[in-house]
Curated annotation (Swiss-Prot):
A GO cellular-component term linked to this record: cytoplasm
Annotated organism of origin: Symbiobacterium thermophilum (strain DSM 24528 / JCM 14929 / IAM 14863 / T)
Residues that coordinate or bind Mg(2+): 172, 192
Family matches, as InterPro entries: G_OBG, GTP-bd, GTP-bd_Obg/CgtA, GTP-bd_prot_GTP1/OBG_C_sf, GTP1-OBG_CS, GTP1_OBG_dom, GTP1_OBG_dom_sf, OBG_GTPase
Name listed for the protein in its UniProt record: GTPase Obg
Amino acid sequence: MFVDVARIYVKGGDGGRGSNSVRREKYVPQGGPWGGDGGRGGDVVFVVDPGLNTLVDFKYQKHFKAERGEHGGPKGMHGRKGEDLVIKVPPGTVVKDDDTGEVLFDLVEPGQRAVVARGGRGGRGNMRFATPTNKCPTFYEKGEPGEERWLLLELKVVADVGLVGFPNAGKSTFLSAVSAARPKIANYPFTTLTPVLGVVDLGEGRSFVIADIPGLIEGAHQGVGLGHEFLRHVERTKVLIHVLDGAGTEGRDPLSDFDVIHNELRAYNPELAARPTLVAFNKMDLPDARENLPRVREALEKRGYRVFPISGATREGFRPLLEAAYDLIRQWVPPEPAAPEAEMVYRPKEEGWRIYKYGGVWHVEGKEIERLVAMTMWENDEAVARFLRILRLKGVEQALREAGAEDGDTVRVCDIEFELMADPV
């Protein structure tokens, strides 16, 4: 089962509510309001941890919620901010909105931080609403709900070299021979179901990371077999080593195998087919491979590919191939990086509000209006009057009347219903 794709739910902490407090002290006969503000809710933050290389942890835990802010207190005391919930993810994690498929973040660099769900603002205490005409208001704001969304995480292995080829071409054997990685090795398709990383040490401080990309089959770019999952891992490698079964032990021709995999890479992402590629002609310990080598080498070298005969069984021919791969890595020119950000924050666009009539009731919808509803103290007449006054200032009442609403019509905002009235509140 793949662990390079995960679907999780994240929610920022709700803001703490404000306080409804009155100052009562000796020698302060007209103390007035003294309620403090609530604290902001904690954020849900992704941090890139270079020590991770899978999304397996998200297989067992899928719901993440940051701490809410503390409520405001008397004497103008401000509630404490909720703790941020920090979630570690491996380098190469792509964060998408599960509903829209929009890419929110592409997390590659160690220590990179991204806020995926912001905490809600703390509600204001009653001292914030004092005016010359209302010197001691009796209401406060509730805390703003934290942002919540479902995310789709995709992991693209970050490696210098990717091994591609048909199942059973000998990639896992090659990787275990040139590094300390120990992939599962057996004679059947899809032996490797997740990428296996290894470090190749050439000495003198020269090393690189190599990844055994799970085996490909014809039609992989259309999702045949486990194609999309496999191809996703290839995209960030700098160099490809195409491992061929030179002996054709599965009854296939090595040159035909090369063309099939090359075409799958090109169909999935044309840039992959143009990536620097070396050909490892494997299983040279078998007579059929030695017989096929001249024909395959001539055909591929005419197309610009360097062919290296190797044997996973005897470990012959590895050094020249690895040296050539290292040289290509050094020649690789990284894309121009974007200006670094200490912390990236996803801020969804506010879409305003809309009005429509359904079942004889006028409905008002919109993130801004929903936030106002959630933070209003509905059990308090002063707070309700403030809510209606804000709707009027935002032009909602005028828009309702222009749409055909009349006095006495029912207006519904979220779960709250009221009658449209001509007289100002």
